[in-house]
Curated annotation (Swiss-Prot):
The lineage of its organism: Bacteria, Pseudomonadati, Pseudomonadota, Gammaproteobacteria, Alteromonadales. It comes from Shewanella sediminis (strain HAW-EB3). This is Ribosomal RNA large subunit methyltransferase H. Specifically methylates the pseudouridine at position 1915 (m3Psi1915) in 23S rRNA. It is an enzyme of class 2 (transferase). It holds the Pfam family SPOUT_MTase.
C-alpha cells in the first residue's frame, strides 16, 4: 500500500524536509509514504485567491491516481485519536487501494479537492502552519502503523 501525501508548497525549511524524511524512511516497504509537492500559486497584495485555489486544486487532483482513496485534511473533518487513525489505516489496507491525503496551502483546500475526498480528517482544532502539518501527518501515520503492528514506538 502507498500513502501519498499531496501538499501545496515546494520550498520548505530544512527542518520540515528532515522531519518528514525521518518518518518516511521508518515505514516498511509494503507501506510506503510518498510526498507530492504542488507549487503554491503566487500570492500578493491583489491576488485572486479563488483563482489560485482553483489552480492548486486542479494540480492536486491531477496528481492522484484514479483508484486512490482520497482524504482531505480540513478543519470541518473528523478528529481521530491515535487508535482511531490506526483503525482507519487498517481499513484502508483492507480496502486494497492506495490513499492520497491532501494538505492545502495558506488558504486551505480548493472546493474541488474537498468534494473529491471520501473522508475528511481534522488534524487539530488549532490553525497549524501547513509545513508543520507534513511532519505531524507523517509521524501520526507512522504511529498508527506501529499500533497496528505491535511495534514499540507507540506507548499507551
Amino acid at each position: 500500500m502507498k500513502l501519498q501525501l499531496i501538499a501545496v508548497g515546494t520550498r520548505m525549511p530544512d527542518w520540515v524536509t528532515t522531519g518528514f524524511q525521518e518518518y518516511q524512511r521508518r515505514f516498511p516497504r509494503d507501506m510506503a509514504l510518498e510526498l507530492v509537492e504542488i507549487p503554491a500559486g503566487k500570492r500578493g497584495k491583489n491576488a485572486d485567491i479563488a483563482r489560485i485555489l482553483h489552480k492548486e486544486g486542479e494540480q492536486m487532483l491531477a496528481a492522484i491516481p484514479k483508484s486512490n482513496h482520497i482524504v482531505s485534511l480540513d478543519l470541518p473533518g473528523k478528529t481521530w485519536t491515535t487508535p482511531d487513525l490506526a483503525t482507519q489505516l487498517g481499513k484502508w489496507q483492507l480496502d486494497g487501494r492506495d490513499v492520497s491525503l491532501l494538505i492545502g496551502g495558506p488558504e486551505g483546500l480548493a472546493p474541488a479537492c474537498k468534494q473529491a475526498a471520501s473522508q475528511s480528517w481534522c488534524l487539530s482544532a488549532l490553525t497549524l502552519p501547513h509545513p508543520l502539518v507534513r511532519v505531524v501527518v507523517a509521524e501520526s501515520l507512522y504511529r498508527a502503523w506501529s499500533v497496528n503492528n505491535n511495534h514499540p514506538y507507540h506507548r499507551e
